[in-house]
Amino acid sequence: MTQTTPVRRPAATRTIVLAAVADLVLVLVFVLIGRSSHSEGFSLGGSLVTFWPFAVGLVVGWLATRAWRYPVRVVLPGIPIWLFTVVVGMFLRVLSGQGVEVSFVIVALIVLGVFLLGWRLIAGAVAKRTDKRAAKSSASRA
C-alpha cells in the first residue's frame, strides 16, 4: 500500500472570502480594543480614521503575496500579510498626521501577529486533523 502526498490546490472562493473577512474583522477588533483602552470610546468616524491605514496595509499584504492562492497558510502569506499590515499601516498613519509611538508599534506587532497568524495556525491544525480523519476513513473503506 503506497501513501501519496496530497496535492496542494489553490483555495476555494469560499475559503478566500472567509480568510479576507477574518483578517479585516481582526484588524477592526484590534482598532476597537485600542481605542477603548485609550478611553476614546466608539465613534464611527474615529474608528474609521484609525482603521483605514491598517486596512490598506492588509490589502497591500494580500496583493503582494497573492494571498488568495493559499490564504490560510501561516508562513506565506500569513507572516508577510501581518508585517505589511503593521508597516504600511504605521507609514500611512504618519502620512495622515496620526500618532505613531514606539510602544504603539510594539503593541500593534504583537496583537496583529497573534490575530493574523493565530487564526491561520488554528485553521491549519483543524485542516490537518480533518485530512487525517478523511484519509483514515477512506483507507478503512478500501
Task: Locate each region found by the language model.
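Alpha-helical membrane-inserting segments
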Residues: 26-37, 60-68, 88-92, 96, ...
